[in-house]
Amino acid sequence: MTKRIINNVFAREILDSRGYPTVEVEIELCDGATGRASVPSGASTGKLEALELRDQDEKRYCGKGVLKAVKAVNGVIANAIIGMDAADQSTIDKALIELDGTRNKSKLGANATLGVSLASAKAAANSFKMPLYRYLGGEQANVMPFPLINIINGGVHADNKLDFQEFMILPIGAEAFSEAIRMSAEVFHNLRSILRKRGYSTNVGDEGGFAPNIESTEEALDLIVHAIESASYSTQNHFALGLDVASSTFYKNKIYKFANKELTSEELVEYYYNLVEKYPITSMEDAMSEDDYEGWKLLTAKLGSKVQLVGDDLFVTNCELIRKGIEEKMANAVLIKPNQIGTLTETFTAIGMTKSGGYKAVISHRSGETEDTTISHIAIASNCGQIKTGSLSRSDRLAKYNELIRIEGTLERNAKYYYGLAWTS
């Protein structure tokens, strides 16, 4: 087989959706094929995720420049991988891991290693004249992901009083991905009208969801249910609800402090139980703190049979942590974020471990995004069946949805889409 030899590697500093710098990498092969990838950035980050290398120079971009990561790509990384076969992804990623030599990519930065890893895969796919999802996933990559769509932002993603970070709609009644997006967009616009009529701001947060200055979780959920019904849908047949609590942000000294409440782990689990009884919530992310292992076990025992319990900060796309969670029965699903681990190979290894343990995998964006659509392709290549990539506004979010709509059109009858409650089974 002809090798796809890397001829040139180049990185630059560009801006993400929050106006902060991030790393973009371009790789050119000897046959002229190229691949370009840009790296996202999180605001709500797990303690154990791979390090995003920043310059810490307050005179540039408020200390958030990424010239150190860019220098690493253009220097030590380029010197190591030029001449390597871009189609040998595992060898390239192994070289990146060994070059860094730390457990959390703190030497070169996960923003440097991931940019190179993704750009290399894209260059190889283009050399083979294949879409990235087909190159990565083979002929069996045909499952369109079920979207978990953020419609109200809170927490560190918005300047409002909501403690919970994301309120999501789950279009369980749609029979195709494009239909799920259409239905969800209709609910989104109905929610905008409702917020305006009630005198709330319709400004959006980092992930494109509305960020009204409401104070309670219940009011946010009531508004969403109203929007669903105003769009002529129901929570029985068309939509369920989801939450990203991001509870680590309000957990301290074994107490959860939010909305004028101070709850123990046991009390918070009971609060969630009552919330699920009142509202059609079928997915909850980071409902317990990443440090509260006993709380996670309590929650999983109480709600794990009826609600998808997604671990993000708990697992940070790290196989060691995923293995521990599966063994100790914490959560029942894993959020997969490539920049939490730093290479494409490690990302797919984490997905494989998640699936083999009987857990669900949810491919995810970050709150600081670019127009890069790689996660859309990873979702299909891995046949994971779920994606979380923000709301139905802001082009950095819509780029991912639009790419999936294009892929669905390309797959035509071969596209599989699990709706109703099948996406969690």
From Swiss-Prot:
Coiled-coil parts of chain: none
Cofactor note (record): Binds a second Mg(2+) ion via substrate during catalysis.
Domain of life the protein comes from: Bacteria
GO terms for MF: magnesium ion binding; phosphopyruvate hydratase activity
Cofactor(s) the record lists: Mg(2+)
Free-text function comment from the UniProt entry: Catalyzes the reversible conversion of 2-phosphoglycerate (2-PG) into phosphoenolpyruvate (PEP). It is essential for the degradation of carbohydrates via glycolysis.
Family the UniProt entry places it in: Belongs to the enolase family.
Xref: PANTHER family: ENOLASE
Protein name: Enolase
Species name: Wolbachia sp. subsp. Brugia malayi (strain TRS)
Gene that this sequence comes from: eno
